[in-house]
From Swiss-Prot:
Family: Belongs to the 'phage' integrase family. XerD-like subfamily.
Residues annotated as the enzyme's active site: K149, R213, Y245
Domain Tyr recombinase: from-to ranges: 85-248
GO BP terms in the entry: DNA transposition
Name of the protein in question: Tyrosine recombinase XerD-like
Primary role: Putative tyrosine recombinase. Not involved in the cutting and rejoining of the recombining DNA molecules on dif(SL) site.
GO cellular component: cytoplasm
Amino acid sequence: MKSYIEPFIASKALSQNSQKAYRYDLQQFCQLVGERVNQDKLLLYQNSIANLSLSAKKRKLSTANQFLYYLYQIKYLNSYFRLTDTMKVMRTEKQQAAIINTDIFYQKTPFVWGQLISLLILELGLTPSEVAGIEVANLDLSFQMLTLKTKKGVRVLPLSQILIPFLEQQLVGKEVYLFEHRGIPFSRQWFFNHLKTFVRSIGYEGLTAQKLREQFILKEKLAGKSIIELSDILGLKSPVTLEKYYKS
């Protein structure tokens, strides 16, 4: 996030002294908040300036809010965060998610690992950890089924015909896991990097595993699945987290 400080300052008509003040405040802000903005980190920043004078607080809040809005505008942040004068953190979500056209996800690409990860999430609603845990022995392409074994239990998921060729391609030479190196599953960071590279290559930068899973949820709901049915498909203990998608 620090790398955006200078472009942000350059986007504003500021005097030299104001530029120095902005730069100083934002460097402090980024040092405390880090690269990922969330409510807890903003509250940490709030506490760090709690004992300053009223004028200093207002200046730092104003600078931080302008920077947060800038990051939201350039789509570095998916949600708009704002610190208020009353020292409360307000978080405004974007519009409710809409179904996107996913045709491009199935087109030929050099980023085959990231493509398959994204398709398994889109087609089956899997989490990254569930994708990482897919074992070769539990994939039955003849009957188009995946038996998914997790700590929460066992789920048998149907595989669509369109997904089969992508799986066949990656199954060659695998010993234990679908995603592995000599029988050892890849790290969480490996999955994150490959997914990020693929979605960026097709023009969907910023589309996370969570958002891809949300696409599965939206499509299943549109197809007529009840909240209980969808909860079972996803392996959830309770349908509570799905309630927001079923509100009228």
